[in-house]
């Protein structure tokens, strides 16, 4: 413990007394704000993936750069790489096919259809936590093997595209015909902060399958891609794993047939690695020492590589031809009887007790072994529904090949959005229902057509609130994670969206707009819905004394009901939309956190979110036409009244009940209730970051800036799914 003499002595020498200890003096060290207030609102989620972290700069155009790529030259190089075994990570049977397939699968397999997050679309496997997940052991080696190819082709191919293409080439080089490949995944340069991987604090914590249905989680254990291959909570029971398998694959939007095809197809090639106890394996890449240079899981068991490799701790080879495509997975599954055993690492697996030694050793041609399977592989035989599908694939290998090709394509492209985002020479021509297909455009409105339509909308009798509400309801379904939803397609007029509670008021405007569309015959309903919002915003700005032009880009089309997967679109129904002051359930997070979640899905910044909420309130765009947050006496006028009155100290706020979801703003002197508000309103005065933005818009000189910012953010949301404008 230092004394005053110590301080005096160091001061006398000219040294700062506070720089002598062992405290971390680096930027960001020390107790953080979140340490003090762990429930602090995550406004920072709206700032991720900015150009400040992008070394390529904001002018970089990946689609343009990809067009310069020697695509088939790249595939040729990948094919050669598959059999160029490296001494620092030798290839099993001289082929990296199984490793690259696993890399692609585990990159894409983090996708969750419930919120559209995860997936392979951003190359997130390069970053924590995914680069160090227990289920991704040794995939650091796969990515490092790809580096010379990435280095050669530079920015003409993103890491995200390269990971998936490498998996495709691995399948093709093993004799399998894939369904196709669509490029277009753009890299990001930092980890996704918005993905909820779960609340557990320890790796491989077990989750009950029923819990997965209530949360946007894609795995039964923290740190796994899908399920524990040893059965739920290491139970070793194939039948009990069925529920977990259905839950996890179902959360990706896969049905039973796709699930069986993916498991069997993924386990037709390659092997698992469990040569010895996992206690020999060192820290993951994020925890490894600096000299490991981004690699992790260094093993001290034997050579640590090749025949001595330890990955999952399981030691399983499924087929007689682990580098060539076959139907041996199903043949072995049903031909032999299986007994539970353990790998050299002690992991639970199964061995074909009555089989001869027909499986080749990956490194010693003189050795053979019996077929082995994972606990979850046997689920495909013992679960009644999975068994029916598996036996059909056993007897019809072509049906299996077709099912796997389509399921693999879906797995690896599910988070890319509509097919219009795909680029490259191997994009399949067929439209698939999970791509949310759209018809070809049939309208090409001229500038005069648009002017005429705007007059018709303005004279329709619809209020500013109705015009703005219907446009927002159509466009705000967009999800930045998987690029689903949005105004293109006018699916607001179709099932299930037209029946959502949140859209009850908005859809009342649809018959009027549908009539205008039918009578004019000049534009799609999708365009007219967005144009209605344009008219509403321009009228509201004019009423506020500002003449503005809201940009509008025609070209949207109208989807048909048969192009709309109702079950998958049900997942886009919001449990909350703070922009419309809507909340369906109170058992999920806080209202203000759900507002941030919605804004993040809409790819909004904090200022954009703030401007939109403030504008939506004064335009009277609440889903139920309530007065919550409508801090103005001139509804329908695009003013900054929301911010002015929210920050006015004449009013004090009190919750109306114990839920503290709704509040009354009373005059401090008279006690009169002046306004009512939700948490999605008051957060702009309570949260220090959002209040700082709100203060800008509440200033006396901010009205014109606010209107311009609102219009810019509004147009951004309306065009989020206009990939044709990129």
Curated annotation (Swiss-Prot):
Q: Crosslink site(s) for Tryptophyl-tyrosyl-methioninium (Trp-Tyr) (with M-252)?
A: 105-226
In terms of Pfam families, this protein maps to: peroxidase
Is Iron one of the keywords?
yes
What's the EC number here?
1.11.1.21
Listed A to Z, the keywords are: Heme, Hydrogen peroxide, Iron, Metal-binding, Oxidoreductase, Peroxidase
Residues recorded as binding heme b, renumbered to this chain, are: 267
Q: How does it assemble?
A: Homodimer or homotetramer.
Family according to the record: Belongs to the peroxidase family. Peroxidase/catalase subfamily.
Name of the protein described by the UniProt record: Catalase-peroxidase
* Organism in which the protein naturally occurs: Shigella boydii serotype 4 (strain Sb227)
